[in-house]
A protein has these predicted regions:
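Short, solvent-exposed segments of well-ordered alpha helices
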Residues: 59, 63, 87-90
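Catalytic Zn2+-binding segment of zinc metalloproteases
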Residues: 72-88
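Short, flexible coil/linker elements and helix-boundary hinge sites characteristic
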Residues: 18, 22, 82-84, 113-116
């Protein structure tokens, strides 16, 4: 089983996760969002993928939609890669469903931050 975590702040995740991949788990600077594959939550040992959105990047409207779509594809590819699940340009229905589910999860989390005032 793999989990998806979505955060809107590096501060919320920096001490709670570690990578079991071949990269350093660190803040990625000036970008709208970053997907961290092969991530493990320290407290539970659960493994999955983490997306961290940078809500200080002044993203709005269509830029949020673009970023969610972009990161959703990264998440789907990371999960399929780790679980050795293949898809191609003709046999991609399962990938489309996973990308849609990831996008919905992102939007649920982002709404809390966008409409908090």
């Amino acid at each position: 089983m793999r989990r998806l975590w979505v955060a809107t702040s590096w501060e919320d995740v920096k001490d709670k996760f570690a990578t079991y991949g071949e990269y350093d788990f660190k803040e990625m600077g000036n970008c709208g969002a970053v997907t961290y594959p092969k991530i493990e939550k320290k407290a539970s040992g659960m493994r999955g993928v983490l997306i961290v959105f940078n809500m200080n990047s002044n993203m709005g409207g269509s830029e949020i939609v673009r970023t969610v779509a972009h990161e959703s594809v990264h998440v789907a590819n990371a999960i399929f890669d780790e679980l050795d699940i293949a898809y191609d340009l003709v046999n991609d229905e399962h990938a489309a469903y996973l990308v849609g589910w990831v996008a919905k999860c992102c939007w649920k989390m982002l709404q809390k931050d966008i409409y908090k005032d």
